[in-house]
């Protein structure tokens, strides 16, 4: 029961979270490529994501913009990108303000908080539902706020 001047209380079960990782990319048209898995990210996992999820969707006019995560700079990743003939760029260090995907993650995390997922096995499905909420107008706004489009 809630009332005026009473603290809102929401019960959350105490558990030890497991590490769920999402690798993702967004495009100006609202299309997202992503993969979800348990555990941390390695250069091998990132290369697999590029090979199976992102690179098959790109045209020669597309540009991949990445932050400076260590695995983005791995030799195997750079060799894969070079062999694909895709253009790729790295953001300056510590520049989340230039990365539209940071804004996408803000929206997705807000969605996940509202979903109140408490069982790890339900998280991948909730993440997929969250990606369905991303619209082209969102992406245009995020890219515009980072000065990639007018």
Where are the language model's segments positioned?
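Extended, low-complexity cationic-aromatic segments
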Residues: 1-51, 148
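C-terminal anion-handling pockets and recognition modules
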Residues: 32, 101-150
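Short, basic/hydrophobic alpha-helical segments
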Residues: 45-63
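RNase H-like two-metal-ion nuclease catalytic core shared by retroviral integrases
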Residues: 67-68, 75, 89-113, 121
């Amino acid at each position: 029961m809630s009332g005026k001047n009473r603290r809102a209380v929401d019960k959350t079960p105490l558990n030890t979270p497991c590490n769920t990782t999402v690798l993702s990319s967004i495009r100006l048209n609202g299309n997202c490529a992503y993969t979800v898995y348990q555990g941390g990210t390695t250069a091998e996992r990132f290369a697999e994501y590029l090979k199976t999820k992102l690179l098959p969707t790109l045209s020669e006019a597309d540009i991949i913009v990445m932050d400076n995560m260590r695995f983005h700079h791995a030799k195997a990743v750079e060799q894969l990108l070079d062999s694909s003939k895709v253009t790729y760029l790295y953001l300056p260090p510590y520049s989340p303000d230039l990365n539209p995907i940071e804004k996408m993650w803000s929206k997705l995390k807000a969605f996940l908080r509202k979903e109140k997922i408490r069982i790890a096995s339900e998280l991948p499905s909730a993440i997929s539902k969250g990606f369905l909420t991303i619209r082209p107008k969102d992406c245009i706004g995020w890219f515009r706020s980072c000065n990639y489009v007018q």
